[in-house]
Regions:
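Active-site-adjacent mobile loop/cap segments within catalytic or ligand-binding domains
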Residues: 18, 33-44, 80-158
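Juxtamembrane/start-of-transmembrane alpha-helix segments at the extracytoplasmic/lumenal side
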Residues: 159-185
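Acidic/histidine-rich catalytic neighborhood of metal-dependent amide-processing enzymes
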Residues: 1-54
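Acidic, glycine-rich loop-and-strand cores that form catalytic or ligand-binding grooves
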Residues: 24, 42-84
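Sec/Tat-exported extracytoplasmic proteins
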Residues: 11, 15, 26-27, 31, ...
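Short, aromatic- and cysteine-enriched interfacial helices/patches
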Residues: 111, 174-176, 200
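C-terminal membrane-anchoring or membrane-association module
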Residues: 187-204
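Amphipathic alpha-helical segments that form well-ordered structural scaffolds
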Residues: 6, 50, 54-58, 94, ...
């Protein structure tokens, strides 16, 4: 985590303000892939809830949630599951410490029926044949869909606001426009009256 800490601490305030999300992808190649919500960020953290909420929203249509039908009409797999939360201090934590919204995609039960931080993790059994291309693809598609949909971006200004401001602007100019029109009509009537009066006077 030293490299992540050094990187985070070297970001300027301007750098940090321009980063909408830091998505750490760590240990997601397990054939028996299970992605649980990790903390920090803790439940109730606004940015953490936003990002994990996006994960849940994206995972359903991709078929990564058990008993949720995917966009192709197929039953979902039990891959993304928020019934359990795991405490994991990983390379995303230094980002959170400096104010960058960050979450961690990680399967800390590496191997079939493995318990927390057990299985093949940090053993000689952690070999390339244990890595599942399908599992990597599942997370890759989720991340890509999130990018395409703008799901990782911070909450944007409500798009109805410009229209609201436009209506307010129209309302604020309506009064002066009406008053101006009324004065114009009065002026025309007055000019017409003067012209008529002058015409009558000349005839006399």
């Amino acid at each position: 985590m030293l490299g992540a800490k050094a990187w985070a601490e070297n970001r300027t305030d301007e750098d940090i303000s321009r980063i909408d999300a830091f998505l750490l992808v760590d240990m997601i190649g397990d054939a028996d892939l299970k992605i649980y919500r990790t903390f920090p960020p803790y439940v109730g953290d606004e940015e953490g809830d936003r990002l994990w909420g996006a994960v849940r929203t994206l995972a359903g249509p991709l078929g990564l949630i058990d008993n949720v039908t995917d966009c192709g009409g197929n039953p979902g797999l039990d891959i993304v599951n928020f019934s359990t939360t795991d405490g994991v201090f990983d390379d995303h934590v230094p980002m959170i410490d400096v104010g960058i919204p960050a979450i961690d995609f990680i399967d800390i039960r590496y191997g079939e029926n493995a318990s927390v931080w057990q299985g093949y993790w940090h053993t000689h059994e952690d070999t390339p044949d244990k890595v599942s291309a399908e599992s990597l693809a599942h997370i890759g598609r989720l991340l890509e869909l999130g990018l395409r949909e703008g799901s990782w971006l911070k909450v944007q200004v409500n798009q109805t606001e410009p229209m609201q401001h436009q209506e307010e602007a129209q309302a604020s100019t309506f009064g002066p426009v009406v008053i101006g029109a009324v004065f114009t009509v009065i002026a025309l009537i007055f000019v017409g009256f003067l012209g008529l009066h002058e015409s009558v006077r000349l005839k006399r």
